[in-house]
C-alpha cells in the first residue's frame, strides 16, 4: 500500500510515523487492500477543529477525521479511448487505487491516551486503524455496523501487538 505521511505539527516522532505506516500496511494486508493508496496528516486540535467544522459541521476538535474518496461522477471511456491513449488505463488504475485521507489530531491522541490509561503509541495506532476502516467503507451508525467495525479494529490492533496495556 502506498501511504503519504504528512506531519503538519512538526511534533510527530520518526517512531510514530514508522509505526503508523507499518500498522496501516498491516491493516491493508488483513483487509485485502494492499494495492490501495491513501494519505495520513498529523494535525493540531486547532486544525482538527477547522476540518471538523468544514466537513462534519461540528464545532469542536476531534481525534480523527476520515475522508473516504468517492468520485462524484463516473468516468466512462470506450475501448477506442483506451486504444488511442494507453496512459488512460494507468491513470484509471491510480484513480481507483486512491481510497482517501486521514487527519489525526496528535493533541487529542495525547489527551485520550491519558484519559483511557494506555500509551500514546496505542492511541495513535487505534486512531489510524479506526480511520483506515472508515475510508474502506466501515462505519458504526448501527449496532450491527459497530460490532463488525470494532471487532475488526480490535483484531487488527491485537494481531499487530498494540493492546490496551
Swiss-Prot record:
Example GO BP: rRNA processing
Enzyme Commission number(s): 3.1.-.-
One cellular-component annotation, GO: cytoplasm
Taxonomic superkingdom: Bacteria
Annotated residues for binding of Zn(2+): 130, 134, 140
Gene3D superfamilies: Metalloproteases ('zincins'), catalytic domain (3.40.390.30)
UniProt cross-references to PANTHER family, sorted A to Z: ENDORIBONUCLEASE YBEY, CHLOROPLASTIC
Function: Single strand-specific metallo-endoribonuclease involved in late-stage 70S ribosome quality control and in maturation of the 3' terminus of the 16S rRNA.
Name used for this protein in its record: Endoribonuclease YbeY
Organism (species): Streptococcus pyogenes serotype M28 (strain MGAS6180)
Amino acid at each position: 500500500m502506498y501511504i503519504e505521511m504528512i506531519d503538519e505539527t512538526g511534533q510527530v516522532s520518526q517512531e510514530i510515523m514508522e509505526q503508523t505506516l507499518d500498522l496501516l500496511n498491516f491493516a491493508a494486508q488483513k483487509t485485502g487492500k494492499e494495492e490501495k493508496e491513501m494519505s495520513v496528516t498529523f494535525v493540531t486540535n486547532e486544525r482538527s477543529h477547522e476540518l471538523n467544522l468544514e466537513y462534519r459541521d461540528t464545532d469542536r476538535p476531534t481525534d480523527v477525521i476520515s475522508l473516504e474518496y468517492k468520485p462524484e461522477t463516473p468516468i466512462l471511456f470506450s475501448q477506442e479511448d483506451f486504444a488511442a491513449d494507453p496512459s488512460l488505463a494507468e491513470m484509471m488504475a491510480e484513480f481507483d487505487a486512491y481510497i482517501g485521507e486521514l487527519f489525526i489530531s496528535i493533541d487529542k491522541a495525547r489527551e485520550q491516551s491519558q484519559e483511557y490509561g494506555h500509551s500514546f503509541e496505542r492511541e495513535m495506532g487505534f486512531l489510524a486503524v479506526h480511520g483506515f476502516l472508515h475510508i474502506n467503507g466501515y462505519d458504526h451508525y448501527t449496532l450491527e455496523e459497530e460490532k463488525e467495525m470494532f471487532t475488526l479494529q480490535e483484531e487488527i490492533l491485537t494481531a499487530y501487538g498494540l493492546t490496551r496495556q
